[in-house]
Amino acid sequence: MTSQRSTSGQRHEQARIGIMPPEILQKRDPVAVRRILESLPDWFGDPGAIDNYEMAAADIEFVSIVAVDSGNVIGVSLTRRHFRESAELHLIAVDPMARGRGIGRALIDHVAADLRNDGCMLLSVHTVGPSFENEPYAHSRAFYRATGFHPLEEHNNLDWAGPILILVRKL
């Protein structure tokens, strides 16, 4: 009995101080996508790009997964299935106030599990390549590596005029 009370007490304390894991669910929320991206200007400083991601969040071609904490969307991901065997992580972003809590990893793990269960074998993601020195994107590349992605190739003029690194993760 003591261990059950202790565990229950720990959960209540975690909830009280806001460290409970977020709920991960499939939901479209273009407004939350815009809000989160606008709060991340080091990655999403182009208003046109934010408009495009907001439209993608409303587009049924993309699967939208969100992380919700206390009723607020604090993380978003958009995935597009190109073929039965492969999909692209089109967007992942976490509210800066919620960074460092494992929310990005939880979103990717959820997306990967859903895709794997549906027969998908490979997940790709595009980010700014290492030949363009930029500290925020160096953090992005490190995050993708830490969540199981491996660099495949770098191209110029793919998603923007500079270098794009394509990373892949086996599911």
Spans of model-derived segments:
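Conserved acetyl-CoA-binding loop-helix of GNAT-fold acetyltransferases
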Residues: 100-113, 117, 138-139, 146
